Amino acid sequence: MHSLLDIHSLSIEDIHSIFTQTDVYHQKKTDTTLKDKDILIAFFESSTRTRISFEIAVRRLGGTPIQFNAQESSLSKGESFIDTIHTLHQYDVHGWIIRHSQALAPSILQTETQSPVINAGDGSHQHPTQALLDAYTLYRKWGTIDGKNILIVGDVLHSRVARSNIQLLQKLGANIYVTGPGTLLPKCFDHTVQVATIHHAIHEMDAVIMLRMQTERMKRGLIPSEREYARYFGMNQAILEKYPHLLVLHPGPANYGIEISMECLQYENVLIRNQVKNGLYIRMAVLKHCFA
């Protein structure tokens, strides 16, 4: 059995195996990988797509998802994260799926349990299953990631999605470019190219990953205005009309009119709904990888 704490823990062989299994689950919707297994889904942050897709994935693999609601737990009475983990550990669950605002919280959990731990997002650090579903969505369209030019746009500084995607897509041979307001870009990412605005590089790109503005993690005043952000870094109908080959992704939830205009959703090369569907099957494949 394996844990999935970050992208670094996955080999190229692991990634392609997960993609292949995801293809299988697109056709075969269920199996018994998790039969008689209780999987604790412990989300200390809010979520729709990730939490629900993991719950459905566990059920389709024959397991029982146990939902932990942080807002209704003893955390609201002052219990610490570690004490909560120690308490939950006593129930001998067979695996954990955890999301937490603290970076490395899944790694801390792993020191307390021998069961597989899957990181469903930890602070601004990692979100490996989001990166896997993003890469798979592109892979399913192209058949390969190798040699593709991919631009990541927006609040890179606060984005665990950006960090995981950069690491995964580079492993698969993509050339990664990043752009966003200077206040929202980290000082450096190894082997990436920074460009001034979305318009400076879009003509060379095969795909663009638009990032959500992480308002819950960022200080006020990091961008002059939402209107200016949309002008220099937003995806809009004019760009899609000019570059019809361009594939567009967004991890959701989107701030429409800022990161991407609502009109973009009508275009077949805007793959936001594909990402949501692929997210279920990727997470089934990840559970298979961790428990098989």
Label each region the model flagged.
Residues 1-52:
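Positively charged, low-complexity intrinsically disordered leader regions
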Residues 34-39, 146-150, 245:
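Phosphate-coordination loops involved in phosphoryl transfer and adenosine-cofactor binding
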Residues 34-136, 256:
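Phosphate/diphosphate ligand-binding glycine-rich loop within oxidoreductases
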Residues 44-56, 140-211:
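Glycine-rich phosphate/diphosphate-binding loop of Rossmann-like nucleotide-binding domains
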Residues 61, 112-114, 172, 189-191, ...:
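Short, structured coil segments at secondary-structure junctions
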Residues 189-263, 269:
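Rossmann-like adenosine-cofactor binding region
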Residues 266-292:
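C-terminal helix-to-coil terminal segments
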